[in-house]
Curated annotation (Swiss-Prot):
Main location: plastid
Residue ranges the record marks as coiled coil: none
InterPro entries: Ribosomal_bL32 (IPR002677), Ribosomal_zn-bd (IPR011332)
Locations listed in the record: Plastid, Chloroplast
SUPFAM superfamilies: Zn-binding ribosomal proteins
GO biological process per UniProt: translation
Protein name (record): Large ribosomal subunit protein bL32c
């Protein structure tokens, strides 16, 4: 017959949740960093294309 398990303590539950949140925050910060880096590279490429078009005209 199934017996209910003991309840997980609040501190243990919060500890696990905080560990998960730290992992998610770390991945989100990395994704944001990569997105900003790509955006800056894109802007640099557009600026160099505009400069080369002005000099060739």
């Amino acid at each position: 017959m199934a017996v209910p398990k003991k309840r997980t303590s609040k501190s243990k539950k919060n500890l696990r949740k905080n560990t998960w949140k730290k992992k998610v925050l770390k991945r989100a910060m990395r994704a944001l960093f990569i997105a900003k880096l790509d955006l800056n590279n894109l802007q640099d490429n557009v600026a160099t294309l505009e400069d080369s078009n002005e000099t060739s005209s």
